Amino acid sequence: MLPSLALLLLAAWTVRALEVPTDGNAGLLAEPQIAMFCGKLNMHMNVQNGKWESDPSGTKTCIGTKEGILQYCQEVYPELQITNVVEANQPVTIQNWCKRGRKQCKTHTHIVIPYRCLVGEFVSDALLVPDKCKFLHQERMDVCETHLHWHTVAKETCSEKSTNLHDYGMLLPCGIDKFRGVEFVCCPLAEESDSVDSADAEEDDSDVWWGGADTDYADGGEDKVVEVAEEEEVADVEEEEADDDEDVEDGDEVEEEAEEPYEEATERTTSTATTTTTTTESVEEVVREVCSEQAETGPCRAMISRWYFDVTEGKCVPFFYGGCGGNRNNFDTEEYCMAVCGSVSTQSLLKTTSEPLPQDPDKLPTTAASTPDAVDKYLETPGDENEHAHFQKAKERLEAKHRERMSQVMREWEEAERQAKNLPKADKKAVIQHFQEKVESLEQEAANERQQLVETHMARVEAMLNDRRRLALENYITALQAVPPRPHHVFNMLKKYVRAEQKDRQHTLKHFEHVRMVDPKKAAQIRSQVMTHLRVIYERMNQSLSLLYNVPAVAEEIQDEVDELLQKEQNYSDDVLANMISEPRISYGNDALMPSLTETKTTVELLPVNGEFSLDDLQPWHPFGVDSVPANTENEVEPVDARPAADRGLTTRPGSGLTNIKTEEISEVKMDAEFGHDSGFEVRHQKLVFFAEDVGSNKGAIIGLMVGGVVIATVIVITLVMLKKKQYTSIHHGVVEVDAAVTPEERHLSKMQQNGYENPTYKFFEQMQN
């Protein structure tokens, strides 16, 4: 009976694995999925035949972000409407992985956790509920968490009910691979123990079977240890040789025979993640070396439950494996781990670990999180032309460091839960609360480091933009001062300067957009500062472009080109203004450090030199024509002094309305509130950081608020006075004074009279008496 039930459950799970949502996958044999293994080409499921296929372009390998995974799903399934991705619940075994540049390979098998590409509108999974099992679900609309978080929630809930997690699925998507709830099925411990080995049910509380050795290692004999070690060694040799064959041959790989001499395999094996030995070394030395290695998660991001032998404790403990890399101290089950490493004494292992193992420096683990100063290295290194690449690497190192620390905490959490099985519920909750606080602390620390990274990157980008703008302005003024000036060369230099200014504006808008996505309140606070900074950019461009019309001959010749440039960029200016005025849009969370906006076109927008600043001033203002500029009969531009500010003076050319413009003055200009149209202007240092405040534009708002406050206070006072007068108005009730010595009948009658009752007989006699 039990074997039949197990077969039925297996068949049902298989049908569900091939099951396709009815909304967009009708008629497909398999669900769209992708799988990644770092160092090999990505794999995707062929929805027509249900087989895994390599990346069609032959170039794409493992992807580090959820946004990238979603984009890759949309690339490999262009005919489907992929709207989201979610990590699969179970790992799968996939064959024929290829290196980059090859599209068809054989014999390469890896176990990975794929990502499901969700089609159309999200539909929750239909979970099978076996007999004696319970279907539960949890939703929290105030949180938006990953697949791993909800898996942990489901597992903890089942554990509190003394049951095992049988199956689960996500509910209520709120972002890319993020959800607001989980549905799950909890089954009694006895039901789960029928389908797995009894030792696993007692020692391993994991609800997922990750594959592995099915042989019974209960005896733990020396012969079986030798057999296991040799089998693993041969498998590693075969994989390494197959990798070498890919680099030499163009055809399909052929599986290597196990009889190949160890000497040849050892010469080609250079990775420290695997331990090879020659025929002269004993198997005991191999086992000691394998079991003495520290647990390695590897560079990949999967969270696969595995076991490794801990030298200090002398037993096998659980940890999370990333899915690639690592070393051979990595076992599917605790029983398998103890069968290999349990027969080796702790003293010999400690002796082995005290001696440094030979390592190839070229094959050290690729996870940079092991270095505590991974981010500090970026912060201490000055910025250069490769700032963006350095920032991306530092961001990746930071995320790798965070993942490694989270993996360590999850391993400790898993071990603590296993040890707290028989403790009271209060102690279990204390353990859970402790690790939840630890996880929150790590998340907060990572968020602070991300913020520091972004701020440093912003400051360096601002410095680079200022340098480029200053250099472009110097070249533009030099071209104007040339004798004779070349109009087209002047226009090219002007165009480069305008582009530099637009880079500044684009960077400002990117920063504002990022703040608006992650913190709308802060965006509302800095909005006026951003507008002020944009005004400074426009005024600076206005002053710079006015220099062109000091040379009428040059300005007249390139007037059409300048007009065309302005007309081309006018539409983009309208979009910028609309974005600044519009309400902040809702984003799916904080996955992106810096939103990647498309490269924008350059824009030339001029503002009036004087007058109050308003949103209308941001509209494109066509440059004044050549006829409106006083003629410069000498066809010269005012000489520009590049000396420091202390060594140069301000001289105004009569009738021009412009000062003797310098590079630093235009690049760092901040218009004073008192200057007139025909007078010189004061030059101040104005950085890209938003510290300026538009005081003038707030006067009207302050006056309006004061008047409104007076009106509201008046209304409140009048209302209070009226209410108080109403309280003192007299309330008349018909109360009849009753003697305390009267009879109960008379007292009852008096109460009736108080309530409005009038006896017709009494009324008749009263009228008679009157």
Curated annotation (Swiss-Prot):
CDD domains: Kunitz_ABPP-like. Residues 291-341 form the BPTI/Kunitz inhibitor domain. Induction: Up-regulated in animals on a high-fat diet compared to a regular diet. It holds the Pfam family Kunitz_BPTI. Changing Y757F: Greatly promotes interaction with DAB2. Expressed in the brain with expression in cortex, cerebellum, hippocampus, olfactory bulb, neurons, astrocytes and microglia (at protein level). Expressed in the retinal lens. Expressed at a low level in muscle cells (at protein level). Residues 18-701 are extracellular. The record marks 197-198, 219-220, 671-672, 678-679, 687-688, 690-691, 711-714, 720-721, 739-740 as: Cleavage. Keywords: Amyloid, Apoptosis, Cell adhesion, Cell membrane, Cell projection, Coated pit, Copper, Cytoplasm, Cytoplasmic vesicle, Disulfide bond, Endocytosis, Endoplasmic reticulum, Endosome, Glycoprotein, Golgi apparatus, Heparin-binding, Iron, Isopeptide bond, Membrane, Metal-binding, Notch signaling pathway, Nucleus, Phosphoprotein, Protease inhibitor, Secreted, Serine protease inhibitor, Signal, Sulfation, Transmembrane, Transmembrane helix, Ubl conjugation, Zinc. The modification Phosphoserine is found at S198, S206, S441, S730. Residues 1-17 form the signal peptide. The modification Sulfotyrosine is found at Y217, Y262, Y336. Chelation of metal ions, notably copper, iron and zinc, can induce histidine-bridging between amyloid-beta molecules resulting in amyloid-beta-metal aggregates. Rat and mouse amyloid-beta peptides have an arginine residue substituted for the bridging histidine residue and are thus less capable of forming amyloid aggregates. Extracellular zinc-binding increases binding of heparin to APP and inhibits collagen-binding. This is Amyloid-beta precursor protein. Residues 181-188 are annotated as: Zinc-binding. Changing P760 to E/F/I/K/L/Q/R/V/W/Y: Greatly impairs interaction with DAB2. Changing Y757 to I/W: Impairs interaction with DAB2. Heparin binds at residues 96-110. Residues 268-281 have a biased composition (Low complexity). The transmembrane helix undergoes a conformation change and unravels partially when bound to PSEN1, facilitating cleavage by PSEN1. Cu(2+) 1 binds at H147, H151, Y168. The chain crosses the membrane at residues 702-722. Residues 28-189 form the E1 domain. One of its GO terms (molecular function) is heparin binding. It comes from Mus musculus (Mouse). Changing N759A: No MAPK8IP1 nor APBA1 nor Dab1 binding. No effect on APBB1 binding.
